Amino acid sequence: MTQANLSETLFKPRFKHTETSTLVRRFNRGSQPPMQSALDGKNVPHWYRMINRLMWIWRGVDPREILDVQARIVMSDAERTDDDLYDTVIGYRGGNWIYEWAKQAMDWQQKACQEQDAMRSGRYWLHASTLYNIAAYPHLKGDELAEQAQALANRAYEEAAQRLPGSLREMEFAVPGGSPVTAFLHMPKGDGPFPTVLMCGGLDAMQTDYYTLYERYFAPRGIAMLTLDMPSVGFSSKWKLTQDSSLLHQHVLKALPNVPWVDHTRVAAFGFRFGANVAVRLAYLEAPRLKAVACLGPVVHALLSDPQRQSTVPEMYLDVLASRLGMHDASDEALRVELNRYSLKVQGLLGRRCPTPMLSGFWKNDPFSPEEESRLITTSSSDGKLIEIPFNPVYRNFDRALQEITDWINHRLC
């Protein structure tokens, strides 16, 4: 089936799809205090979703493109679930978040199909994949339209990979007790086996969101990147997130000696946000298999155990947490009790001495991840490194931090 036909098949105009903001029915929603963070964007008044400009621009989206799509959503007079929230238009039609971002992605997909130059075509496919992922954001379980956008994002990503430098392999890993999981191994030019970073992404992102990380930071240093969707989303959607948050990544890590392109004696893990929960667990449970673990804005204890901090987090992020935990109609109290069990300190891991070198980067006044969180990680390691990342200028400092983290990982893998 051609890309165009697939798009038409998946996105038939219908108006009965459940609107994203209604998928999680928590009982006592509160008011949203203003909040901004480098990794998550900010909760802009009159938007259900957090507007994550830094990460979208970092992934290659032009700021003007973001504003154009937002403008189309704002200007729509179609029926909304909540008249006060622009991005709650009901049904797949003009003004609906998924519709507008997918429409933008389809324009780039069409350009990719028409482009004769393979490299340029690959760039267009990659851009289409990024936009489809934004369409599906924040990837709540049961969001049919978002799942269709994710399918298109993955297809576009595969098309891009065939045309861009290096090589990409789609790999399937068996996991006892359930469905196998699909991972993407990104390999730089040259002969393997390669030192490899196992990417542990955030709960509101897909594994295909990290190509920029590979291309700009790992590939130039000859490092491969292996990505895997977090439990309950994407290719790992049949797995529920549990307190054993590292289960899927752990099975993949154990299988690496059987992957000929990976030097399984030189593997590190890198965790963004809740992905750090996975990475730090691996540092304790699989120390002999890991040379290093790096974290950025980690969510390993404070947000999971502190009701006060949870009350400052935007509704969308709490919905993401509830969705991943399979608690679609839970009260905030029930959600808090469950989240506490995911704290690595409560689990008895963090605070104990860990032989794996661990680095953690943080931003001052980060509502999701205070400085103490990163300090707890680095002081638990026998070889810890703490990095404070200045907020402004946000893009330049983010790039500088990633360069420093990659150099640290590279040094540990050598």
Swiss-Prot record:
NCBIfam families attached to this UniProt entry: PRK05077.1
Name this protein carries in UniProt: Esterase FrsA
A Pfam family: FrsA-like
GO molecular function: carboxylesterase activity; hydrolase activity
EC number(s) given by UniProt: 3.1.1.1
Keywords for the protein's UniProt record, in alphabetical order: Hydrolase, Serine esterase
Catalyzed reaction equations: a carboxylic ester + H2O = an alcohol + a carboxylate + H(+)
HAMAP family the record matches: FrsA
Domain of life of the source: Bacteria
The keyword Nucleus appears for this protein: no
Name of the encoding gene: frsA
InterPro entries: AB_hydrolase_fold (IPR029058), FrsA (IPR043423), FrsA-like (IPR010520), FrsA_esterase (IPR050261)
Function recorded in the entry: Catalyzes the hydrolysis of esters.
The keyword Ubl conjugation is annotated on this UniProt entry: no
Family: Belongs to the FrsA family.
